[in-house]
C-alpha cells in the first residue's frame, strides 16, 4: 500500500492527497507536523520536506513527481495526456506554475517570519496578476485542458483554495477563474482530500 507523508496545511501535500482520492485507491496518509517534523522525514527526503510517497522500497518526493508516478501506476482516471507531445506541454505548464506562482506561494507560507512584509506583498500582487491573466481561458474552457480534468487542475487547486487564507483578493476580471475554482472545489475527491485545518482556510 502507498503511504503519503503529508502536511495538514501544506499546499504541495494537498495536491497529492487530491490525486490519491481522485484515483479511488487504497492508501494511507500519515500527517506530519510541519513545525516539529519527525527525524525519519530527513532520512527519506534530504530536503526535509513533505509530501513524501513510500511504496515498498520506493521513496519519492516533490508533489508533481509523486503525482505523475501515481497517475502512471493507476491510470484510471488518467490525469496526464496519453500523447507524448501533449504530455510534454503539460509538464512545461507545470514547471511554469512552479516558477510563476508557487515560488510566491512558498513566500506566503513563511509569512509568520517577521521582517518579510515587502516580499509578502510583492508575492501576493504577483499571484493576483498572474491568475487574472489566466482567467480568460475559462470563458471557454471547463478545465485547463478543455472539458477534461487533468494534472494542471490538480496543481493549481491548492492555491485557489488558499486565496482568502493568503489575503489575495481577485478583481471582477478574474470571475471566470473563480467559477472554474468552484468547479474544482465541488469535486468529491477535492472535498475528501481536505484536512480539518484546510477546511477553515476558506470563508
Give the location of each predicted region:
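GST-like domain detector, emphasizing the conserved glutathione-binding G-site
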Residues: 1-130, 135
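Short, solvent-exposed turn/loop segments enriched in Gly/Ser/Thr/Pro and often Arg
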Residues: 7, 151, 197
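A generic structural-conservation signal
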Residues: 29, 147, 172, 193-194
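Conserved beta-strand edge residues that scaffold enzyme active sites
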Residues: 34-35, 177, 198
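Phosphate-coordinating loops and pocket residues in cytosolic domains that bind phosphorylated ligands
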Residues: 43, 81, 186, 195-196
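Terminal-tail/helix-coil boundary detector
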Residues: 195-203
Amino acid at each position: 500500500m502507498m503511504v503519503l507523508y503529508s502536511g495538514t496545511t501544506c499546499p504541495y501535500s494537498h495536491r497529492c492527497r487530491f490525486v490519491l482520492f481522485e484515483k479511488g485507491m487504497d492508501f494511507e496518509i500519515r500527517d506530519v507536523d510541519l513545525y516539529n517534523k519527525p527525524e525519519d522525514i530527513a532520512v527519506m527526503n534530504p530536503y526535509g520536506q513533505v509530501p513524501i510517497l513510500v511504496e515498498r522500497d520506493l521513496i519519492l518526493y516533490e508533489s508533481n513527481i509523486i503525482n505523475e508516478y501515481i497517475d502512471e501506476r493507476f491510470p484510471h482516471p488518467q490525469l496526464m495526456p496519453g500523447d507524448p507531445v501533449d504530455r510534454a506541454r503539460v509538464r512545461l505548464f507545470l514547471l511554469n506554475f512552479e516558477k510563476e506562482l508557487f515560488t510566491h506561494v512558498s513566500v506566503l507560507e513563511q509569512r509568520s517570519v517577521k521582517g518579510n512584509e515587502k516580499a509578502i506583498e510583492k508575492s501576493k500582487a504577483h499571484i493576483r496578476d498572474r491568475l487574472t491573466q489566466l482567467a480568460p481561458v475559462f470563458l471557454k474552457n471547463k478545465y485547463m485542458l478543455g472539458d477534461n480534468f487533468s494534472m494542471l487542475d490538480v496543481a493549481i487547486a491548492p492555491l485557489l483554495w488558499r486565496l482568502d487564507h493568503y489575503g489575495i483578493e481577485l478583481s471582477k476580471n478574474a470571475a471566470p477563474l473563480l467559477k472554474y475554482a468552484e468547479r474544482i472545489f465541488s469535486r468529491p475527491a477535492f472535498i475528501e482530500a481536505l484536512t480539518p485545518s484546510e477546511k477553515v482556510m476558506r470563508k
